[in-house]
Amino acid sequence: DNKGLCETILNLNKNIASVAIINKQGRPIEKISRPEFINPFPDYMSELFCMHCVLQISMGRDFDEQYGPINYHISERPNMTLLTFPLADSVIVVSVSKNIGPISLAKKIAKITSNKEKN
């Protein structure tokens, strides 16, 4: 269940601002956020942003045979970090405040997503 997966990830750490599952067309199919972190984007910005995240993971899959599958992708910006994870035909996008080391968190989330794909 997508909502349960989003809640599980959000509850891993209080520095996680939001979790979204995006389909391969770049449309969110589930979103959850902490109220204290909400920073609204205009609809067109959210759509472009989601398509960017999907395209990034999708293009990376072109090299799975050569290098192995992507576990996660980290994008650090001045005021937030974005983590993206492949999940079957969708992508999980997690936004995180700058108060946490992204690699250890990304590894925890990747473990959850790989267990989800096995079930």
Question: Which functions belong to the PLM regions below?
Answer:
Residues 1-119:
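Non-catalytic interaction/Regulatory regions outside core domains
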